[in-house]
Amino acid sequence: MAERSTDFRPGLPSQRQVVELLDGEFARAGYDIEDVVIDAATRPPRIVVIADGDRGLDLDAVAELSRLASEQLDTLDTPPYVLEVTSPGVDRPLTEEKHYRRAQGRLAEVTLADGSTLTGRIGAVQNATVALVVREARSNLTVRDIALDAVVKAVVQVEFSPPSPRELELAGVSGKET
């Protein structure tokens, strides 16, 4: 994580301090800290903790993580601030194996090192390879195994209609919600 603070404000914790303070509590709750943004330019300043987990981040999880973060941050002597705990959002690039695992069953646009772009449904991830269910013809679905180190960029796409049961089955998520 790159240190991102829009302004210096004496007494506010650094990004590193926030991560060190919260990482253990979030991990025990089953979540990872993806990023911390400290915006000292706003009044009051904002501390934004971006978290994700294998179960996703629903409202109950956000409330629990906010409570945990608030308890930990309250141990510091800081000026007043606004705490926000949020998920990375759908437009976050998939950059780590865990991101692909969490996005299994979702549609993604994947740009490869050779310059080609594929759109497909994310399947199982194992041994640094992701299975991508691609539609090669109007109704012909194929599973392509793609090495994660061959991926330059991958972003989950917003969908407006449900995928076919066969597509979900090939992605390894039949019977699950995506």
UniProtKB/Swiss-Prot annotation:
One of its GO terms (cellular component) is cytosol. The keyword Cytoplasm applies. It comes from the Bacteria. It is found in: Cytoplasm. Belongs to the RimP family. Required for maturation of 30S ribosomal subunits. This is Ribosome maturation factor RimP.
